[in-house]
Amino acid sequence: MFGAFVSHRLWSDSGCTTTCITNSIANYVAFGEQIGFPFKSAQVFIAGPRKAVINIQKDDKVELLKMIDKHNLWVVAHGTYLDVPWSRRSAFVTHFIQQELLICKEVGIKGLVLHLGAVEPELIVEGLKKIKPVEGVIIYLETPHNKHHTYKYSTIEQIKELFLRIRNTGLKQIGLCIDTAHIWSSGVNISSYNSARQWLRSLEDIHSVIPPSHIMFHLNDAATKCGSGVDRHASLFEGMIWKSYSHKIKHSGLYCFVEYITRHQCPAILERNLGSSMQLQTALTAEFNTLKSFLK
């Protein structure tokens, strides 16, 4: 279930005006076939990302549904950076998130990723309760990156506390998005195979609270040191999490994450947004070749 973030800017043909998301996905699928790694998943923006504006047009909706069905893709949408239903603007935000969820349903997108805030679990649950569930579309709460806040949601204990509250409140269609760069930035050392295995075994221990069917990953290396609180992604084995394991990859924490993802068939997205299409495709070719070697 491996794939990548598909940016309209870097993947669509020049001059594209009406069906740019579909066009981007078509080019992305063709690229996967070209490098010998047929993609099973993808992540897109259907709104924003920095403004509360829907940016998928009517024609694009029709064609995107066909494209997703044709290639049997698992696609998730990333919410805008304003999608914070536990904020003071929650009435407007909740309405906008509801629009995004309905569009996801309409075009065959399986989930919407929202950034978790560094706030108490009860505030997050109260915000989620304002959103009406949309059948077949999961809201994935993404692990945040922070340094000083009490609630980082990078430890299994805090993840369990949050999802117990979610379950006990009766909320449906809520999942977890684990960003490896974020939990590293928040102070969790996942560089070695053994350190990652310890964290992931603890995650498996709470599968009764948050099942793997409701877990996805943002598979990113990080350009900053562990516990920095700074979110800066890097290509796999090019950042500070796993670069020291580039010549002994099966001893890396990344290898353990790939084992978990494969074992439980979780979607995993590489989030890369480089300067040009050529830079992006060069980086992704190397990364997916590495993943291919893991999966042999």
Swiss-Prot record:
Gene Ontology annotations of biological process type: base-excision repair
Residues binding Zn(2+) 3, per UniProt: H182, D231, H233
Residues that, per the record, bind Zn(2+) 1: H78, E271
Broad class of enzyme this protein falls into: hydrolase
Molecular function (Gene Ontology), one example: zinc ion binding
Source organism superkingdom: Viruses
PROSITE patterns per the UniProt record, alphabetical: AP_NUCLEASE_F2_3, AP_NUCLEASE_F2_4
Keywords tagged on the record: Disulfide bond, DNA damage, DNA repair, Early protein, Endonuclease, Exonuclease, Host cytoplasm, Host nucleus, Hydrolase, Metal-binding, Nuclease, Virion, Zinc
Stated induction or repression of this protein's expression: Expressed in the early phase of the viral replicative cycle and accumulates at later times.
Main location: host cell
Pfam family membership, one: AP_endonuc_2
Disulfide bonds: C16-C20
Annotated compartments: Host nucleus; Host cytoplasm; Virion
Binding-site residues, Zn(2+) 2: H115, E142, H218
Entry keyword annotation includes Magnesium: no
Cofactor note: Binds 3 Zn(2+) ions.
InterPro entries, per database record: AP_endonuc_2, AP_endonuc_F2_Zn_BS, Xyl_isomerase-like_sf, Xyl_isomerase-like_TIM-brl
Requisite cofactors: Zn(2+)
GO cellular component terms, semicolon-separated: host cell cytoplasm; host cell nucleus; virion component
Function: Endonuclease that plays a role in DNA repair. Cleaves phosphodiester bonds on the 5' side of apurinic or apyrimidinic sites (AP sites). In addition to endonuclease activity, the ASFV enzyme has a proofreading 3'-5' exonuclease activity that is considerably more efficient in the elimination of a mismatch than in that of a correctly paired base. Displays 3'-phosphatase and 3'-repair diesterase activities. The single nucleotide gaps generated by the AP endonuclease are filled by the viral AP endonuclease and DNA ligase.
General remark: Consistent with its intracellular location, ASFV encodes its own replicative DNA polymerase and three base excision repair enzymes: a class II AP endonuclease, the repair polymerase Pol X, and an ATP-dependent DNA ligase.
Family membership noted in the UniProt record: Belongs to the AP endonuclease 2 family.
Protein name in the entry: Probable AP endonuclease
